């Protein structure tokens, strides 16, 4: 599912990262999860990996990193918490069975 500028969900990404970090920045995990379930999302691009982020961004992400996830009035940071939230909304990503859910979360945190 392509990025949809009108989608209710917004994921923050860096405009630029150095070659050694490409593919390893944690917003990729969130975007991948949304793509897997066909959930449209918009993308907010902020400065590069080593740039100081604007104060208004630090209110959403106190470490100045990515991603930040916004949906309606909800704002989350840290990819693990965002992935659990997305998984809670869609069983294809996070099983309801306690044992299976625990295994899925173990792999999610390890990744």
Please report, for each region that a protein language model flagged, where it lies by residue.
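GST-like domain detector, emphasizing the conserved glutathione-binding G-site
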Residues: 1-111
């Amino acid at each position: 599912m392509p990025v949809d500028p009108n989608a209710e969900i917004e994921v923050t990404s860096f405009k630029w990262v150095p070659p050694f970090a490409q593919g390893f920045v944690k917003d990729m995990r969130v975007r991948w999860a949304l793509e897997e379930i066909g959930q449209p999302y918009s993308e907010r691009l902020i400065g590069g990996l080593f740039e100081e982020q604007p104060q208004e961004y630090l209110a959403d992400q106190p470490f100045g990193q990515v991603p930040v996830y916004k949906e309606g009035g909800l704002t989350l940071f840290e990819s693990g918490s965002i992935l659990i939230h997305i998984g809670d909304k869609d069983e294809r990503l996070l099983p309801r069975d306690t044992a299976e859910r625990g295994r899925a979360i173990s792999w999610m945190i390890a990744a």
